[in-house]
Design a protein with these regions (language model features):
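Structured alpha/beta reader/binder surfaces that contact nucleic acids or chromatin modification marks
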Residues: 1-137
Length: 137
């Protein structure tokens, strides 16, 4: 099942350009099929779904210092930002990004996905990658 997350513009740009290949989160969607599902991204501060990416796998990690040592380049955020987020968690999941693209026409989260607010972590959606592929930039 596809999911929706919210990210700031600079991280969306890094994901689509290939500079950021790992998204780290406190959890992962258990009903997500890496072979066919995708993650839609809402730009933080807006109602617009502007991009999507596919995930190759989810990896569990428990030590933020080791995560930073091993994956700092792929994570694509400064150390202080990472540690401000990471110190609050006991478990971390690395979402390995396989491919990403901007949507040609941004989608309104309410009209297209039926969401009234931007998700804090992630939410499931019935909207599919096939729908989005017609809107690729």
């Amino acid at each position: 099942m596809n999911v929706v997350i919210t990210l700031p513009r600079n991280l969306i740009t890094a994901i689509v350009s290939g500079a950021k290949t790992i998204e780290f989160r406190k959890s992962y969607p258990k009903d997500f099929d890496c072979r066919q599902d995708c993650v839609f991204v809402i730009e933080k501060g807006t109602r617009n779904v502007v991009a999507y990416f596919c995930v190759s796998d989810f990896q569990y990690e428990s030590n933020p210092v080791e995560i930073w040592r091993d994956y700092s380049i792929q994570i694509g955020v400064p150390f202080f930002w990472f540690m401000a987020y990471a110190h609050r968690c006991r478990a971390y999941y690395l979402w390995r990004i396989r491919k990403a693209a901007y949507l040609y026409t941004p989608l309104d989260r309410g009209l297209s996905l039926g969401l009234t607010t931007n998700p804090q972590s992630y939410v499931y959606t019935q909207y599919t990658c096939a729908h989005a592929s017609s809107d690729l930039r």
